[in-house]
């Protein structure tokens, strides 16, 4: 299956940002008033074909964005390689590991949907098993409407404390 045929979670921009009253650029903490309203809107997600959403700024694709902090308090930083899924990000640096979210059939809450997706991405991207990501902490959101990628994506930010030996890069250059 092509990555563009993947069924992903999106939220209508007008619903997510309350007709732009809650729009922001940068990082928004979970306890901020806008952050709380945006979190509430996440439960109104829809499932759409990724290829149809890549150029449609009327929807925001939800992305898990996981910060990995080691036992010394250092945050992982890495360069996005050509083997990664989003060509427009190749060669750029990132402090977040993650990717597109999918529906979780049978999930009891939006919290479960977010966590299951973040844990799946951690396993895929850096080999971090579920039992080693249980200390995952939801921090808030990142958004950047100033570039083509950011106009159609919004990151749900988590922080996970890990041991350096538990993390291994899975992505390679092609």
Q: Can you name each region flagged by the protein language model?
A:
Residues 24-74, 80-84:
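Acidic, metal-coordinating catalytic segment for phosphate/diphosphate chemistry
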Residues 59-63, 70, 90-96, 153:
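Short connector loops at helix/strand junctions that flank enzyme active sites
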Residues 167-174:
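NUDIX/MutT-family hydrolases
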Residues 74-120:
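Conserved Nudix-box catalytic region and its N-terminal flanking loop in Nudix hydrolases
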